[in-house]
Curated annotation (Swiss-Prot):
<dbReference type="InterPro" id="IPR005227">
    <property type="entry name" value="YqgF"/>
</dbReference>
<dbReference type="GO" id="GO:0000967">
    <property type="term" value="P:rRNA 5'-end processing"/>
</dbReference>
<dbReference type="InterPro" id="IPR037027">
    <property type="entry name" value="YqgF/RNaseH-like_dom_sf"/>
</dbReference>
<comment type="function">
    <text>Could be a nuclease involved in processing of the 5'-end of pre-16S rRNA.</text>
</comment>
<keyword id="KW-0963">Cytoplasm</keyword>
<comment type="similarity">
    <text>Belongs to the YqgF nuclease family.</text>
</comment>
<dbReference type="InterPro" id="IPR012337">
    <property type="entry name" value="RNaseH-like_sf"/>
</dbReference>
<dbReference type="GO" id="GO:0005829">
    <property type="term" value="C:cytosol"/>
</dbReference>
<keyword id="KW-0378">Hydrolase</keyword>
<dbReference type="InterPro" id="IPR006641">
    <property type="entry name" value="YqgF/RNaseH-like_dom"/>
</dbReference>
<dbReference type="GO" id="GO:0004518">
    <property type="term" value="F:nuclease activity"/>
</dbReference>
<keyword id="KW-0690">Ribosome biogenesis</keyword>
<keyword id="KW-0540">Nuclease</keyword>
<dbReference type="Pfam" id="PF03652">
    <property type="entry name" value="RuvX"/>
</dbReference>
<protein>
    <recommendedName>
        <fullName>Putative pre-16S rRNA nuclease</fullName>
        <ecNumber>3.1.-.-</ecNumber>
    </recommendedName>
</protein>
Amino acid sequence: MIVIAFDFGIKKIGVAVGENITKKGRPLSVLNAQNGCPNWQLVKNLIQYWQPQFIVVGLPLNINGTKQKITNKSEKFANLLKYKFNIVVKMHDERLTTVEAKSIIFKKNGFKGLKEEKIHSCAAVIILESWFNQY
């Protein structure tokens, strides 16, 4: 089963793809966004190409589990995916995924590797693999 994951952000949205047999994901791309709104044609192209069973969207929460300012925008993004593309969308806790992504990238490439695009797509992989491991 193929699954796409999104690491939602106001300016950048990381994308990863994976499958449940290996429980592994890989980074695809980073979509530019304006106030959390991506180019929907690019999203459509990804969905048509990969034909995922469903989509996982990272749910940004504070460490204590409460909502952040961006949480509602992430939920709105997930709802738009659901209705625009008639696909099941699941939200998944993304606490500390950006920190983990930065750590992974830094270990591999040092400070030069810490580019925003790599961080968001790596975070999307972490969200996806976390979802696979939980379910």
